[in-house]
Amino acid sequence: MMSTLSYTLGQLAAHVGAEVRGDADLPIQGLATLQEAGPAQLSFLANPQYRKYLPESRAGAVLLTAADADGFAGTALVVANPYLAYASLSHLFDRKPKAAAGIHPTAIVAADAEVDPSASVGAYAVIESGARIGAGVSIGAHCVIGARSVIGEGGWLAPRVTLYHDVTIGARVSIQSGAVIGGEGFGFANEKGVWQKIAQIGGVTIGDDVEIGANTTIDRGALSDTLIGNGVKLDNQIMIAHNVQIGDHTAMAACVGISGSAKIGRHCMLAGGVGLVGHIEICDNVFVTGMTMVTRSITEPGSYSSGTAMQPAAEWKKSAARIRQLDDMARRLQQLEKRLAAVTSSGDASSDA
């Protein structure tokens, strides 16, 4: 049976530096949206489009800015950034199991591997020769940690994560199930129509405070390491090819695909389904909208798009038909321009006469 987590509103306020407007002793047992929250739950208003739900919300208390709290009759925690406060408080109510320190009897650990006594190694995990596991690391069941790979302190690997050999991971990195780090990059040389494999002799280096989603893959470098900077956040099912470099605090949504040797700057955001060709560079502070195909380097910060926005199917079919006619339309336009130029030239000559 699951025990109930409970905090007073005053305790939550102290955790995020909020001003309490209402009963500081009110018990809060969870978090929920404005529409779904009950009297024992805390909610938040971060997006103006949800403001319409605030007056009717049954939440015991709501995280609000000072401006929103002034017109609110209920109990509130007043903060500068409600969404950031919610993010901080969410960890207090996280029921993710915490593994006890130690190595499960079914795990296989190489004799020369180093596992900190405070680390946890789950059932049927494999830790190969020369690997080093830092303090407080949690390795889930059926994980594989390849030879000479390193996991920094406080790391968390869900079940079935695979690290190939020579992967270096910084502190406090979280990796979800199915992720594969350090697989061989897609490198081949063509000889008379036959593909000859290129050994991928680099590794992967990942910084601190990185999050890697389920079934995301990061290939090892062909020569030097594939590099993932500090604070990078990667969603599920992302493909990062060999020798890619990703700058600090860049975030990517699901199904992004990055071709080999691309370099992405710091504080960038790539929305779902974005694709990058290889050997290009993206500068810092770039936002790329969903389904965009980036085919050349981006040298100026800002927002970039190439995807086609949704429209009713009948309209889209008409637009697609027009696109197929563009070459013909361009030729006809050029002919009209030539005729117009000839008429204009003839008229000018007559005027001069």
UniProtKB/Swiss-Prot annotation:
Keywords: Acyltransferase, Lipid A biosynthesis, Lipid biosynthesis, Lipid metabolism, Repeat, Transferase
InterPro entries, A to Z: Hexapep (IPR001451), Hexapep_transf_CS (IPR018357), LpxD (IPR007691), Trimer_LpxA-like_sf (IPR011004), UDP_GlcNAc_AcTrfase_non-rep (IPR020573)
EC number: 2.3.1.191
Pathway where this protein functions: Bacterial outer membrane biogenesis; LPS lipid A biosynthesis
Pfam families: Hexapep, LpxD
GO MF annotations in UniProt: N-acyltransferase activity
Role of this protein: Catalyzes the N-acylation of UDP-3-O-acylglucosamine using 3-hydroxyacyl-ACP as the acyl donor. Is involved in the biosynthesis of lipid A, a phosphorylated glycolipid that anchors the lipopolysaccharide to the outer membrane of the cell.
Similarity field: Belongs to the transferase hexapeptide repeat family. LpxD subfamily.
Record's subunit section: Homotrimer.
Name of the protein this chain belongs to: UDP-3-O-acylglucosamine N-acyltransferase
Gene (UniProt): lpxD
